[in-house]
């Protein structure tokens, strides 16, 4: 059995969105080793029910616990909104979500806060609740953006249609005169060049990825689990097509990762089928 400090940090998302968190881990915690899982066979998570999301998260965490990770970062806002509090009580390892770190960062930037997210995250009101717990007088506008994750996973970042979709989602927030925009989905950082074509320069962008990694660093230090030796290569795993994930992730990682397909433990007698993503 390896020393706890040498164990990997588990990171999971529905797809490539969690790579934004992974890059922050490389930057802020370069000596840590990572196990990354993308649940690509079942994305997008944003249209799933809370019950299904909780089942998916339990399956992922059960597998990661068997892999002896020392911590898990839920690099998925939908999972963080709908499952974090429950699974923190069920699993004997530190599990961090992205919403509270994102909310804390948002209120440091402004008081008129727009949040773009998946429909499930928006419906949960998780960001609104988290922001108001910190700053009750902050104004929060939430916008569900169901098309963003499929467009990113289909590598349509430079498609003119994506720009038009983004304009439609962002215009109500601009009409509300927001001063801060929170990426309420880890995928959305990949759309930053698109957003910059639409948003005035005074609107501050908040990406929770960097803030959840800062929280992870602090947690590791408190628990005495920081690794001080050389890291080992990141292990990339998916539930869907490894080649598709590897090709898509190259543009954000700067290298083409070796990706393996794994099978999660099914904790229900009926495992929901993946949603079909249509163009």
Curated annotation (Swiss-Prot):
Q: Does the keyword Cell wall biogenesis/degradation apply?
A: yes
The pathway is: Cell wall biogenesis; peptidoglycan biosynthesis
**InterPro entries, sorted:** Asp/Glu/hydantoin_racemase, Asp/Glu_race, Asp/Glu_racemase_AS_1, Asp/Glu_racemase_AS_2, Glu_race
**What keywords appear on the UniProt entry?**
Cell shape, Cell wall biogenesis/degradation, Isomerase, Peptidoglycan synthesis
The record places the active site at 76 (proton donor/acceptor), 185 (proton donor/acceptor)
Any idea which positions bind substrate?
Answer: 13-14, 45-46, 77-78, 186-187
UniProt-recorded name of the protein: Glutamate racemase
Species assigned in the record: Synechocystis sp. (strain ATCC 27184 / PCC 6803 / Kazusa)
Instruction: Tell me the gene name.
Output: murI
């Amino acid at each position: 059995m390896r020393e706890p400090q040498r164990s990997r940090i588990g990171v999971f998302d529905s797809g490539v969105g969690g790579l934004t968190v992974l890059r922050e881990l490389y930057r802020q915690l370069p000596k840590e080793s990572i196990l990354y899982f993308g649940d690509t066979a079942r994305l997008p998570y944003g249209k799933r029910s809370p019950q299904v999301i909780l089942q998916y998260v339990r399956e992922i965490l059960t597998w990661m616990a068997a892999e002896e990770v020392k911590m898990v970062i839920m690099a998925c806002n939908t999972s963080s909104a709908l499952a974090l509090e429950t699974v923190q009580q069920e699993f004997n390892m530190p599990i961090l979500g992205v919403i509270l770190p994102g909310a804390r960062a948002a209120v440091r930037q402004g008081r008129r806060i727009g949040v773009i997210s998946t429909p499930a995250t928006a419906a949960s009101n998780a960001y609104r609740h988290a922001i108001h717990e910190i700053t009750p007088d902050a104004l929060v506008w939430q916008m569900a953006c169901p098309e963003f994750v499929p467009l990113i996973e289909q590598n349509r970042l430079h498609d003119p249609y994506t720009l038009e979709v983004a304009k439609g989602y962002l215009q109500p927030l601009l009409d509300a005169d927001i001063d801060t925009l929170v990426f309420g989905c880890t995928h959305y950082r990949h759309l930053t060049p698109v957003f910059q074509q639409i948003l005035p320069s005074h609107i501050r962008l908040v990406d929770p990825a960097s803030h959840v990694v800062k929280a992870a660093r602090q947690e590791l230090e408190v628990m005495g689990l920081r690794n001080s030796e050389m890291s080992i290569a990141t292990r990339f795993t998916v539930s869907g097509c490894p080649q598709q994930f590897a090709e898509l992730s190259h543009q954000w990682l700067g290298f083409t990762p070796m990706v393996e397909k794994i099978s999660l433990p099914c904790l229900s007698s009926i495992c929901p089928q993946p949603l079909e993503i249509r163009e």
